[in-house]
Structure formats: C-alpha cells, structure tokens
Amino acid sequence: GLDLVFFDGEDYGKHTDTDYYLLGSRHFAANLEGYRPVAAVLLDMVGGKGTTARREGTSDERSRAFMDYVFARAQALDLRYFESTPGLPMLDDHVPLLQAGIQAIDLFGYDFAEWHTLRDDGSAVDRAKVEETGILLRDLVYNFKFEK
C-alpha cells in the first residue's frame, strides 16, 4: 500500500539544536517494527518560483539507485523542473529513514530565495512546478517498479 506521512524537520524551529530537529521522522524511523517501507520520497520546498529540483547530495550518496530511478522517470515524463544535476546535501527528514535502512530521497527545491522570509507564502509558488511534482508522484504511485 501507499502511506503518506507528514513531517517537518524544524519541529520546534531550532535547526541548530539537533535534540529538537527531525523529531517526527526520527520517531517514525525508530518505530518500524513489523513494517518496512520499500522506499520514501520527501518533498522539501518543491514548486517555488525560481527553484529547480536537483539531485540532493545525501540522497544521491546513500540512495543512488532510487534517485536514478526517480530522475529517470522525471526525464521519461519530460518534466523540466527535475534537473539531473548535483545539489547540495541536506540534513532533513529523509536522513533518519536512511539510517533505518530505507531507500529515501529528498526532492528539494533549490534556490528558493523566499525561504523563511515574509515573502514565503502562496505567491512564491509556481503552479507549473507543483503540477510537474504531482505528475511525477502520480507516476511513482501507479508505475512503481523499483527494487533495491
């Protein structure tokens, strides 16, 4: 089946204090007894105006085969928002999942100038980029054929 799980890495807003960071995903990853997801996709600031979704560094290093699969699907679907170029590594909710042995990637919208500013609102969203993200996710749900 398909599970939707919602986390916010900045649970308490203290990204400099790792005791209060990634709480939801750390709890989820620590309580997987009897349950093992095949893979996980984290959506992180996707769809912002001026952003591109590139190959997030931690995902590319630790889940390269799954990252290859997802970006190949995006290319096959002619989704231009997803650029198969290297991106910086991120400490985010995919990391506890990776540490738990789950193939996890962070689809990250790089170069989002409005992040954590008063302009970080609905007007900063690019509808076409959100739509491309939805097309990719729908494809992954209906046509998923990834094996570790």
Report the location of each language-model feature.
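Acidic/histidine-rich catalytic neighborhood of metal-dependent amide-processing enzymes
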Residues: G1-A65
